Amino acid sequence: MLDLFHGFNWDLGNIEKCRKHGVSTDEVESLFESDDLRIEPDIANSKIEKRFNAIGKTAKGRSVFLVFTIRNHENEILIRPISARFMHKKEIDYYGKENSRI
């Protein structure tokens, strides 16, 4: 999945939003290396820019829910994380029925 993008667009704002929920930048980035990554458009929250929801496991094996957008910065396509949090047990159970690896 990462081969479609040039990297990530981090700043203090989105780093802090992820840290607030205990998720590091390394964990967010490792989601995109996961074989079980699921990405869906977030239509309800895409009024200003297209947003996406992603779920998957980090390199540490922790299930994470991520909201992100795609940015074009200096002719590079970047993933811009907006917020990330660990998935609740109910979410893991729900998505686990569809994808047993999450």
Feature annotation, model-predicted:
Residues 1-102:
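Ribonuclease/tRNase effector modules and their secretory precursors
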